[in-house]
Amino acid sequence: HKKKYELAFIWIDEAKSITGNNNPTIRNTYAVILFNANYDKPNSPEVLSTLEESMEILQRCYNDDYRKIYHARIFAEQSIKFKSKYPDVSRKRGYLELSMKWLESELKNRPNDRWMNNLKRSIQRNLR
């Protein structure tokens, strides 16, 4: 059942219409589907645009929702993938730097979170 993005978009659009697009978790899911549905396509202006749209949605989710750790995690994971596909755009947009800022903020509340610390180290490696 992997990579059934058209079906996923149908379901997430239905969920968005029911909630009025105000649910950050649904918007986050939409952003993840949008990113994953386009990531493996050949580089093009359209692909870049959809990946950037996904990152913008995740930034709004982080800013709008109290469950920041979830959005920070997804944003950080996508930032690493974005950098591998579009390194120059990634640098210009500052996605990795923003990921680091958010992870450091979340780690203040969970300093021993192994998964978060591993993700932070991965971001640090990608910033070099």
Question: Model-derived features: where do they sit?
Answer:
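Short amphipathic alpha-helical "recognition" segments used for binding
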Residues: 6-10, 81, 110
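Internal alpha-helical scaffold/solenoid segments in large eukaryotic proteins
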Residues: 1-16, 24-29, 33-35, 52-56
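Alpha-helical junction/boundary sensor with strong preference for TPR arrays
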Residues: 12-15, 19, 51, 58-65, ...
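Generic low-complexity segments that are intrinsically disordered, proline-rich and/or Lys/Arg-biased
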Residues: 43-46, 112
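Amphipathic alpha-helical repeat scaffolds of TPR domains
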Residues: 1, 20-40, 63-85, 101-104, ...
